[in-house]
Amino acid sequence: KEFYEYVKDNVKEYLPESYKDAEIKLQEVEKNNGLKLTGITIPNGDQRIVPTVYLDSLYQEYIHGKDVDSCVGDVADMRIEAQGKAEFLDMGVPDILDYEKMKNKLQVRICDKEWNTDRLADKVVTEHGDFAAYYAVNLEENGEGISSIPVTVSLMNEWGVSVEQIQADAMMADKNRGVQLVDMTQIVESMIFGGTPKNLLNEKLDMETVENPMFCLTNESKMNGASLLLQEDIRKQIGECLGSDFFVIPSSVHEVLILPDNGIFQVPELNAMVQEVNETQVERQEQLSDKVQFCDKKTAVMENAERREARLEKEKAAEKAEVKGGIHGRLEKAKAEIKAKEADKVPKNKSKELEALTDKNKKLMNDIFKSSGL
């Protein structure tokens, strides 16, 4: 677009002298769920890590009346502001190839498998039902956010480790970031009145005393915490805490909501709720999925809630058909046995006796039906 090219051609006028020889590039960057953004990279000297400044929000301001040169100035300001962090990260670049130094910085990221096929093509990925997990190295984590690089297949090969090793170390690093299961009511109260919601993960709740049974699973930083859902022992803890099976609502990449299966919630209604919230409340790149999950308390097995209901219906129908088939099989076998015995005993000309035996056969059939509840 003309706006992006104008920014590229004029941004040097707003930058310090050290950027005069910078080879400025525009690039399309694919983010979560197929969202594509336009970014600009402006190197400073021989710096190896170059921050990307995304232009899409500025373009929206431009089409709503903001002066184009003011937008260019904003891009320059953002690039200068990012320089300090880029220099800090640049110092750690040699360590990126040292797996022992990086493994504690790993983090699991989770997304909808169907929504992100192209984006995941070059990355280390593990599949978990409806979800795909990919992995990142968090070079810096603070209250303002996370600076990270994705774990690509080529980086894994440089490390000389397996996918399984990366997954195990990333899950351990995620646990070390803190696992939190909190009551949604307490979260709302803390936002209004202050205070910190209680972590319920190791508690055993009396659900009859919980007025609105809805809980949030995330990490201490509330950043990329939904991936904790993939850890079996955490799902087991949640089941023990609630004392029941539970539904998992994929609210965003940062957290998931947990609802006990208490007979109140219906899967079609939950799916509709998630889809509506995604469309109206959650930014596209932060949406996790629109597929509600069900988790069994005893086994900690998680599966698509809608497909689970369909599977149970199918199993129930098959079981019912099998029961019916078994009863009718017994009837046919009894009839065949009676016919075989009487054929040996009864002369063909004794029609009255045969009629009596037929009545006896009918009575036996009726008795079998009665005993089977049919």
Regions of interest found by a model, annotated:
Residues 22-216:
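Charged, alpha-helical interface segments at or near domain boundaries
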Residues 275-311:
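TerminUS-proximal long segments
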